[in-house]
A protein has these predicted regions:
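Signature of alpha-helical transmembrane segments and their immediate interfacial
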Residues: 1-36, 442-444, 510-560, 602, ...
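Interfacial segments of transmembrane alpha-helices in multi-pass membrane proteins
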Residues: 3, 7-13, 299-304, 339-395, ...
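Surface-exposed amphipathic alpha-helical segments in non-transmembrane regions
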Residues: 17, 24, 29, 33, ...
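Hydrophobic, glycine/alanine-rich multi-pass transmembrane helices and their short helix-loop junctions
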Residues: 358-363, 380-397, 449-501, 549
Length: 763
């Protein structure tokens, strides 16, 4: 079979060359269209359920929301485990699935179970969007030079204009907004007036809700026309709310404005976002309250295509849609990292091709032969790109970096070198070059085929890997296998045909001094090894033992996920769990100022707490910073373009802020680590038990022990306790004496302390 393929290629040379050119062109187009990821998506399939219940303690959230949700969700097919998190006002539940079904199927099953759960009034569960940890592809802020638009106005523009437009971009699943106060109409009731008029909070709430509706009244006929009837009763202004009638006394209406003041104000915030810019002149422009957003890519979608749509939409927003002076300003654009990664890979590939050509010329000693062999590299690369594109597998730095050019050109080297050897043999001088080349190809066709086939077979176990390791290494295995298949096709079919064209006038024999020198010393080494077999075997065993020692005794480090320099730093500061919003924001401002003071940092953002939609399950005890970095060539000499040195210097500066535990990572890397392990960190130790106090005590003991482990830089404990509560216990006998229900008391306390959202005003 192999012989027939070679014969077919030799007999149809122009057809083979035409097919090769078509494959080259197709491969170039496929390489241009091939989705390229900076980082492989290794996260498991998961579905997130976010339940917000404002004002409710973490303990009550756990008992009345999280546990019922866990109970209902247990038993869903293909669920491997559940992760739950209960915070003040928030329950976050993640269901981790295996790879048996598509995530759309998983979401349908979760939605079916979600309809069966019964939760307390006010608790509103919803499924999180279908995105992956590498799906945060575009971070932006809204910037205004128009004094008419303050941060509250920008928040409204973000929620009602920007978010809607970004969601219209194909494969954009959601936009997560962070920062800026949400506008609301606030009715501040005077308790004394409420008592004097004999009213209750419930009565006021009921009338406010009832007086913000529209209704329909069928239609009437007027002449030849039908006129629809609308009863317009929606609230449009502060005056509409203030004039809402609660009740009447002796024929006189009692309005909201008689017992309360009505105004516009900010909703109670769950987090705050800020940004500082380090200008070229050394000055720092700091804005401690900014409206930001994160554009989320649908899981499995093409990031390049989505980013192109985002860039077009941003241009449209800035030029046509947003008010004058308001602009969308990006501070993280995944396309920058993708372009940097692509440039790095292509640069390395180009250098590799040049080095291979030089080495081939030095050892083969023939320029035409070296060119034939070198053509294997672009052909194999473009062939792999075509196959990956057809199979829908995106390329990434790990898969492209795994291409070994020496392995790719191995078969072509054997084929072409044997052809050159036959062509320079004086016995073949009178024969046709095509006959000599065919004979030479037949001579090595089987060894070349089996050698490359064996290498491809060696990658088969990687295709059986599951879950995280499979998603990490399978794209690499596919890329290498396709490239080797392309190299095999080139070596067996195209290389002999090219030889008939380039060697049709024969091959001049050249006494290669480098090869002569290498062969001479190689023969001496082989003879010496054969004469001393015991020593040769002993050296081999000793080398093997040393390799095992370096590998398994810690001399060579190891990591599960590959490290990619993202050109930025992600800093997390963990505060005391009882910290208040004002103190957390003040500490975040200090940290942002210190980080942005480094000349290597062009800008720095900070976020405290969580977004209003609850998509990041954390509290005010958590502060996170995105630290953008200039190109390493612009860093100060003292850091020697070493990111670890810069991080160490930042850590020393941040230690000036007491009571904060600092950790350093990178934006994508941080998301991936949390997705894989379920915690915000590279490595985590989990302790299981029933007593939270004992668990925290043991956690502190483990931390004290780990501090002595060499190589650990950032270490901390995630506290499950420490949030103080002010408990109101209802005296049921006194409540019964005054004929007051417990629910009325709770509603009054909730409204007085945190307010109660009654209805919605559309403007």
């Amino acid at each position: 079979m192999i012989r027939k393929l070679v014969d077919f290629a030799m007999e149809n040379r122009f057809l083979v060359l035409a097919a090769a050119l078509v494959l080259f062109g197709w491969g170039a187009i496929s390489f241009h269209q091939l989705p390229i990821e900076a980082y492989p998506d290794v996260a498991d399939n998961y579905v997130e359920i976010i339940t917000q219940w404002p004002g409710i303690s973490a303990e009550q959230i756990e008992q009345q929301v999280t546990i019922p949700l866990e109970t209902v969700m247990n038993g869903i097919p293909h669920v491997t485990h559940l992760r739950s998190f209960s915070l003040f006002g928030l329950s976050d539940l993640k269901l981790i699935f295996d790879d048996e079904e598509e995530n759309a199927w998983n979401r349908e099953r979760v939605l079916e179970r979600l309809a069966q759960v019964s939760l307390p009034p006010g608790a509103s569960p919803q499924m999180g969007t279908d995105w992956s940890p590498v799906g945060q592809i575009y971070f932006f802020t809204l910037h205004s030079t128009n004094p008419q638009y303050d941060v509250m106005e920008l928040k409204s523009i973000e929620d009602w204009v920007v978010e809607k437009n970004f969601k219209a971009v194909p494969n954009i699943v959601d936009v997560s907004s962070f920062g800026g106060p949400t506008r609301e109409y606030q009715v501040r009731v005077d308790p004394d007036k409420l008592i004097s008029y004999g009213l209750s909070i419930a009565q006021v709430e009921q009338q406010l809700t009832n007086n913000n509706t529209n209704a329909g009244g069928s239609f009437i006929e007027s002449g030849q026309q039908q006129i629809n009837i609308r009863e317009v009763g929606l609230v449009r202004s502060v005056g509409d709310i203030a004039n809402t009638v609660i009740t009447t006394r002796s024929g006189t209406p009692l309005r909201i404005k008689d017992i309360a003041t009505v105004s516009q104000g900010p909703k109670i915030r769950l987090g705050q976002f800020a940004r500082a810019i380090h200008r070229e002149d050394g000055t720092i422009v700091d804005n401690d309250d900014v409206v930001s957003g994160i554009v989320l890519l649908r899981k499995g979608a093409d990031a390049d295509e989505a980013l192109a749509g985002i860039h077009a939409k941003v241009k449209e927003l800035n030029e046509r849609i947003l008010p004058p002076g308001v602009k969308v300003v990006p501070f993280i654009d995944r396309s920058d990292l993708v372009h940097y990664t692509t440039h790095t890979v292509l640069h390395n590939l180009t250098e590799g091709i040049i080095l291979v050509v030089i080495v081939l010329f030095l050892f083969v000693g023939n320029v035409r032969a070296a060119i034939i062999v070198a053509l294997t590299i672009p052909f194999a690369l473009l062939f792999a790109a075509t196959c990956l594109n057809l199979k829908g597998i995106p390329a990434n730095l790990l898969s492209l970096g795994a291409l070994d050019f020496g392995m790719v050109v191995d078969g072509a080297v054997v084929m072409v070198e044997n052809i050159v050897r036959h062509m320079t043999n004086p016995q073949n001088a009178s024969r046709k070059p095509s006959e000599v080349i065919r004979e030479a190809a037949h001579e090595v066709q089987r060894p070349v085929f089996y050698a490359i086939a064996i290498i491809i077979t060696a990658y088969l176990p990687i295709f059986t890997l599951q879950r995280v390791e499979g998603r990490l290494f399978r794209p690499m295995a596919w890329t290498v296998a396709f490239a080797l298949l392309g190299a095999l096709i080139f070596s067996m079919l195209i290389a002999p045909v090219l030889s008939t064209l380039l060697f049709r006038n024969g091959v001049r024999e050249w006494d290669n001094p480098l090869m002569t020198y290498s062969i001479t010393h190689y023969r001496k080494a082989v003879k010496s090894a054969i004469k001393r077999p015991a020593m040769t075997v002993g050296i081999g065993i000793a080398g093997l033992c040393l390799a095992f020692m370096f590998t398994y005794m810690g001399a060579i480090g190891s990591e599960f996920l590959p490290h990619l320099d993202e050109g930025a730093i992600w800093v997390r500061g963990t505060l005391a769990s009882s910290v208040g919003p004002s103190e957390a924001v003040a500490l975040a401002n200090q940290g942002r100022t210190l980080l942005c003071s480094f000349p290597e940092v062009p800008d720095c953002t900070s976020q405290v707490g969580r977004p209003d939609d609850g998509t990041d399950a954390t509290g005010f005890f958590n502060t996170e910073y995105f630290v953008n970095l200039k190109p390493k060539e612009q860093w100060r000499p003292e850091f020697h373009q070493d990111k670890d040195r810069l991080i160490a210097a930042m850590d020393r500066e941040l230690e000036k802020i007491p009571g904060v535990n600092w950790g350093f990572s990178q934006p994508i890397e941080d998301n991936m680590e949390e997705a894989v392990s379920g915690v915000k960190g590279e490595l985590a130790t989990k302790i299981y038990g029933d007593d939270l106090k004992v668990l925290e005590q043991k956690a502190d003991e483990i931390v004290n022990t780990m501090h002595r482990v060499r190589g650990i830089e950032d270490l901390g404990v995630f506290r499950a306790l420490g949030q103080p509560n002010l408990n109101f216990e209802v005296d049921r006998e006194q409540a019964a004496r005054y004929q007051i229900n417990v629910a009325d008391i709770q509603d009054a306390i909730q409204t007085a302390a945190g307010g109660n959202a009654l209805t919605q005003v559309l403007q």
